[in-house]
């Protein structure tokens, strides 16, 4: 009985005012993982360099392409 009451009080303590779970460790970890994946994808795409089609840019004549967009200097 006491264990159930303690669990219930802990759940209430971590809830926001609207009754949804607050900033728990799990939700923060998920957000950090998502931002880490996005950061990794950006750096991976920047390493994939091709020659610029029209004019030289940033590093000599190399520029970067992102899927769905044109070439850009990074």
UniProtKB/Swiss-Prot annotation:
This is Conotoxin Im6.10. The keyword Secreted applies. Residues 20-47 form a propeptide. GO terms for cellular component: extracellular region. Keywords: Cleavage on pair of basic residues, Disulfide bond, Knottin, Neurotoxin, Secreted, Signal, Toxin. Disulfide bonds join 49-58, 52-63, 57-73. Residues 1-19 form the signal peptide. It is found in: Secreted. It comes from the Eukaryota. The lineage of its organism: Eukaryota, Metazoa, Spiralia, Lophotrochozoa, Mollusca. Probable neurotoxin. The presence of a 'disulfide through disulfide knot' structurally defines this protein as a knottin. The cysteine framework is VI/VII (C-C-CC-C-C). The keyword Signal applies. GO terms for molecular function: toxin activity. Expressed by the venom duct.
